[in-house]
């Protein structure tokens, strides 16, 4: 009985390690491809409450690992748009129509340009793949498509792991 319990714990641990390795590779690849300051995966652990669980950085000063983000700003309306496949692309947050709550949060983590794609697993919003840049940046169509495809690939891989 003890051996079986230990095996189950080890299996869960291996799945978690494999999942985290997959997510880390995807964020590293995305940051390298886009040449941005930071790429993160924001995971929703309950309805519209989440945390940055993986990040890839150009410089350690950009770290927000473990951040719970602007949970008070994110709501069902935002979630619904992402569930419908919305890709958020902002060239300059200062010229955007973000609400003050969201804008203040992005400023606090030194985001100037933002590109975000949903990670949808089993028809639920599992998380967000977000590319942040500390300077104004115009996102190219192929960059937007790359991030969309990365998020879809991650969603498929995560679904297979569960």
UniProtKB/Swiss-Prot annotation:
Pfam families: GAF. Disulfide bonds: none annotated. This is Uncharacterized protein SYNPCC7002_A0852.
